[in-house]
Amino acid sequence: MKDRYILAFETSCDETSVAVLKNDDELLSNVIASQIESHKRFGGVVPEVASRHHVEVITACIEEALAEAGITEEDVTAVAATYGPGLVGALLVGLSAAKAFAWAHGLPLIPVNHMAGHLMAAQSVEPLEFPLLALLVSGGHTELVYVSEAGDYKIVGETRDDAVGEAYDKVGRVMGLTYPAGREIDELAHQGQDIYDFPRAMIKEDNLEFSFSGLKSAFINLHHNAEQKGESLSTEDLCASFQAAVMDILMAKTKKALEKYPVKTLVVAGGVAANKGLRERLAAEITDVKVIIPPLRLCGDNAGMIAYASVSEWNKENFAGWDLNAKPSLAFDTME
């Protein structure tokens, strides 16, 4: 049987990435060109800057991904691309490059939901058994997803306001930490104590929804009031207290979801899945189901995860036409 190679593209935000997946499960290359240094001085991602960077490096990323995989353009058998959710200008760069490559070589084009990519990155650890539950935590999303089979995703709970990664970056900015602040807050949290009383919104309510805006506001108010009074606060203790509140919320809702949807596997994915504190809480508290977390290199935005997610779409022959457009607000279906 002839080997099949998927060339995957991911440009939904501030990472330009191209990857090659062989025979559905062997990631031969996963090239990532990060823009973090360009966005640091702004304290967040600037959409126009992100789009320009994607345009500048996308061709080089394609060439490097093919070279690292040890294949040529003629060896590629399908092309996959993120078409949403994300920044519309950024999405269009990767999607346009993918469409051009597929059209030029007469290859099928596979549309992939960015969040499905995060979820299916867990496939790199071991074959997934369905049905399963997923906790997706990133800079733009916080949601619980029920997956009955590969490619069938239903949201069963999500944030009402801020995503967890967004909350990390906003409190990090208040403390003067470097963007993105998640890793530094995690490290500082392990050096401090949970001594500040921050709210855990909806933690006792019988639903699967999250809310982090109240926690973020309480943190900002505490920090601001201390500055106004000339009081000194421990950055380590602030981080420890903030992270403890976040983890209490995530764990409470995830446990409720596992009670409502009895599955054997919990996937935890997205950029915040790299958080050491979250991994520690999961290991200590979720012991009756298998917990699968992608390796660190596949937690952030990358094309490797898009390649993994495209496999089920390819098997279903869910191909896109040349009129496929970016959908910045693309979402999974919601399940009551």
Curated annotation (Swiss-Prot):
Fe cation binds at residues 114, 118, 301. Belongs to the KAE1 / TsaD family. Its EC number is 2.3.1.234. Keywords: Acyltransferase, Cytoplasm, Iron, Metal-binding, Transferase, tRNA processing. GO terms for biological process: tRNA threonylcarbamoyladenosine modification. This is tRNA N6-adenosine threonylcarbamoyltransferase. It is an enzyme of class 2 (transferase). It comes from the Bacteria. Substrate binds at residues 136-140, 169, 182, 186, 275. Binds 1 Fe(2+) ion per subunit. It holds the Pfam family TsaD.
